[in-house]
Amino acid sequence: MTRNDLLDRLATTQASALETQGLGLVPMVVEQSGRGERAYDIYSRLLKERVVFMVGEVNDQTANLVVAQLLFLESENPDKDVSLYINSPGGSVSAGLAIYDTMQFIKPDVSTLCMGMAASMGAFLLAAGAKGKRSALPNSRIMIHQPLGGARGQASDIEIQAREILYLRERLNTILSEVTGQPVEKIARDTDRDNFMSGDQAVDYGLIDKVLARRG
């Protein structure tokens, strides 16, 4: 399998996932080459430019796709940045942490950009980008809060789930403190309820580094 075939397969899987999420048909791009015309879905073409999309709910399928693309792009060039574009309401904490750990694990810097909404785990991953390379578009909204969860069953089962949620809350607060420079105590207070921010407010808070009105 050639490099282009692998790129196509990775991005086509993502395109299919986005269609499954109800985002409609995926546009195609036609390029001319010495061998004639070649058609790419738009995500395959952007993956060639080292752009990865995280759109919609953060779940195991999303995480698997993003992780696979990050690892592939590292193998292609470990010294060139990867861009992660985020428009997500959040979702699974475990899936989000899988993406976070991979972002830290790979050698290339991962720059992050919020387009539209980065909430919950979406905001967490936005803030987890390389320092100095985290940004948002002017009308983006960013929201942080504590992990959500529910439990059913015997009292002992509910107690176990409650301990796990408290552990995850402490772990996420610690990481947010590291990436924002805010004290853990302040993070805990500010995430007690849904906390919405504009791009400029997110810069002041340390979640991102800049608001981009136009590509530089």
UniProtKB/Swiss-Prot annotation:
What catalytic activity does the UniProt entry give for this protein? Hydrolysis of proteins to small peptides in the presence of ATP and magnesium. alpha-casein is the usual test substrate. In the absence of ATP, only oligopeptides shorter than five residues are hydrolyzed (such as succinyl-Leu-Tyr-|-NHMec, and Leu-Tyr-Leu-|-Tyr-Trp, in which cleavage of the -Tyr-|-Leu- and -Tyr-|-Trp bonds also occurs)
Q: Does the keyword Protein transport apply?
A: no
> SUPFAM superfamilies under this entry?
ClpP/crotonase
MF (Gene Ontology): ATP-dependent peptidase activity; ATPase binding; serine-type endopeptidase activity
Keyword terms, alphabetized: Cytoplasm, Hydrolase, Protease, Serine protease
Question: Which InterPro entries does its entry note?
Answer: ClpP, ClpP/crotonase-like_dom_sf, ClpP/TepA, ClpP_His_AS, ClpP_Ser_AS
What are the annotated GO cellular component locations? cytoplasm; endopeptidase Clp complex
* UniProt KW rRNA-binding keyword: no
Write the Enzyme Commission number(s) for this entry: 3.4.21.92
* Predominant subcellular localization, coarse grouping: cytoplasm
GO BP terms, alphabetized: protein quality control for misfolded or incompletely synthesized proteins
Q: How does it assemble?
A: Fourteen ClpP subunits assemble into 2 heptameric rings which stack back to back to give a disk-like structure with a central cavity, resembling the structure of eukaryotic proteasomes.
Function of the protein? Cleaves peptides in various proteins in a process that requires ATP hydrolysis. Has a chymotrypsin-like activity. Plays a major role in the degradation of misfolded proteins.
Spell out the protein name for this chain: ATP-dependent Clp protease proteolytic subunit
Say which species the protein is native to. Cupriavidus necator (strain ATCC 17699 / DSM 428 / KCTC 22496 / NCIMB 10442 / H16 / Stanier 337) (Ralstonia eutropha)
